[in-house]
Structure formats: structure tokens, C-alpha cells
Amino acid sequence: DANLILSSWRPVALEYSTFHDLHLEPRLVQSAQMSTEAEILQPPRDLEGPKSHPSWAVVNDAIDQDGQVLIFVGTRRSAQSEALKLSKRIEKRLKKEDPDRLKRLQDFASSLEGRSQTAMAERLAESIRGGVAFHHAGLTYGQRKAIEGAFKEGLLIGLTATPTLAAGVNLPARRVLVRDLKRWDDGMSRPLPVMEVRQMLGRAGRPKYDSFGEAWVLCKGTDGWGVADDVSERYFFGPVESISSKLASEPALRSHLLASVATGGFRHRGEIGDFFSATFLGASITKSQLNE
């Protein structure tokens, strides 16, 4: 007897934009309602920087505006590689413009490096010295918490991360860039679900600090304009995928069933049906399908 509640409200307005060949094209603004009106959208503009490294153009532009950037990539290796590349470029700029911040970054990096003498800790410290850190499940709990704290305090300029950050950590930034829209799955490269990309883009905009958030998607391909239109149509204006129960997978269902039996949760067969009929799976399929 539940009522469905829908809300498009956001504490900070969110501007969705496509980014290709250093050209930024705002497409949609989400606040109390969706809007594509020209007077609300920011005008298109071109960023300065090398076309071979568009992420740097995004971060460099954010530094000009005293902002921070979250960059989502497809793999842990990509997160580390991108962080190190950006770090080297930012370090050169900070040496000229903000040596005090560079010193604080170096002190923070040294403190992290001293806690754990591992190759991962060394790579993390190397990237932090230039104002960028990478964030993924391969880091220790202490490393992740230290990085998140430094980003929230404004010490770190950028953070490269895998999509797990979008699902599990409340870490907003003024600007979010989704660099990779595909990932390797079942032996082939597949596009990310709309739901997942929206989760990442939704990290843009810091309540109490920003008047709006910038949600950018990098569009790759020889026909940048065409790709950008397709990306906008799917990820900004397209419908979100339907939610399905993980218990619909036989291995997952079997695992939960055996665990419940082993821990004494079920005493007879009838209790099994009663339990699973009360789950999302039970609400999604017919009773006869559930019994089968």
C-alpha cells in the first residue's frame, strides 16, 4: 500500500553539457524543472588546451574559475594514469601561481606515503603532489578517507575515479567530467547504462558553495558533433533503464536461499515462498513464476 513519490528537485541547479574537440555545448538545465531554453543555458564556448588531452583542458579551465573537478573513467588503471598525467601539468602551473598550495600538497602526499610503503601508496603520493588524486576500490580505507577529506577541504584540485565513487560516496564537486562512456564487459566494449551516467553527473554542484553544477560528458569519435548529439539524446534526454531485482539471477537467488537455510531462517518450504514473495523480485513477477 505504498505511494510512488517523484521529485526532480535539486539543491543546486545542474547544467548538462557535451564536450568534444575542446568545444563545450550546454544542452539542459535541471533545477526545480528541466529546461532547454536558451536564456537559461550558458552560451557554447571553446576551451584552451591540447586536443590530445581534453581532460587537462577541463581541469585547467576549472583552476581559472577556482573550482574542483571529478573525472570518471572506466578502469582503475585509467584512474591512476589520468591522475598522474594531470598532476604533472598542474604542478608546473602551481609552481608559478600558488607555491603555498603546492607545499601543502607535498606535505599531504608525504604523510600518506609514510603510512604505507607500497607501490600503490607511492603512485598516489606522486599524483597528489600535483593536486590530483585517484580514487578506487584498490586503495585502503585510510587512503580513501584522507583523499576525500582533502578534496572536501579544497586542497585537491581534481579527483579521478571509477564509477563506484558515484554510487557510494557523498563527494560533490562544482564540475564533473565523464571521460569514458564505455567499459569492457563480457568480452566486448559496451556503453554505460543511462542510470549509471546520471549518477556520476549528479555529483556536480556543491550545496552552500555553488549556484549551479557543471555536468560534462566527453564525446569521442571522428564525428564529434554527431557523437555529441547522440550522447545528449541518450544520456541527457533519454529514459532511464527499468530497475530489476538481482535475485532474478539464479546464482544470486541460490546463494541467498542457501544462506537463509544454513542460518536457520527457514524451517519449512512454505516460509521460503512467503519470504521471497515479499522481496522486489516477488513484486516484479507472477506467483507462479516465483514458485518455479
Language-model features and meaning:
Residues 2, 9-12, 66-67, 129-130, ...:
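Short glycine-/polar-rich loops that comprise or flank the Walker A/P-loop
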Residues 142-151, 238-292:
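C-terminal accessory/connector segments of nucleic-acid motor ATPases
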